[in-house]
Amino acid sequence: MRRFAASFALLGFLLSTAAVAGGEGRVCKVLPQFLDKKGRQSLSPSLYERDAYQAYLRKHPQLRTGLRLEVLWKARGVDWGKTKLRAELRGLLTNSLETVTLEEPVKKSGFFGRWAEFNLTGDEFGKFGKLVAWRVTLWEGDRQLSEQESFLWSGVPAR
């Protein structure tokens, strides 16, 4: 009985310290994908088909009408009213480096991570050029919880 009480007290202590530490979150995965004229990144739900279609769109830039960043993220213990994802994209058009920042509030959902989308389409995509680097961050108010960036992000200066 004493072991049970001690275990219960230890569990209560650990849970209370986790609550005091504040929220935590993580950007798990970022997938940049081109969109075709119908707004699709794939012709079917198959991952193989998606990768093959993305390779086809890379070889045929005239068929691209947009860019989508699919972001897998997760968070817990955060103030959901202040939590947001921010995507920063750097593109090269002729000799001009363009930086676009997109933000999206996140909503509480399930225990596991959730996917969010950032779309760059229309005139914005036409002025953006070729994607050179990206960075996605998860924020709770003014506090950055997590970050994931492409390997070229640090090597490409912002303008």
Give, region by region, the residue ranges found by the protein language model.
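A eukaryote-biased signal for short, well-structured alpha-helical docking elements
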Residues: 22-44
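Internal, hydrophobic beta-strand segments that form the core of beta-sheet-rich folds
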Residues: 130-147
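Short beta-strand elements
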Residues: 144-159
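Bacterial N-terminal signal peptides
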Residues: 7-16
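Solvent-exposed serine/threonine-rich low-complexity stretches and specific carbohydrate-binding patches
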Residues: 98-109, 150-152
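Extended low-complexity, serine/threonine- and proline-enriched intrinsically disordered segments
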Residues: 79-99, 136-138
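Contiguous beta-strand segments within globular domains
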Residues: 42-82, 113-120
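Short, solvent-exposed, Trp/other aromatic-anchored flexible loops in extracytoplasmic proteins
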Residues: 107-130
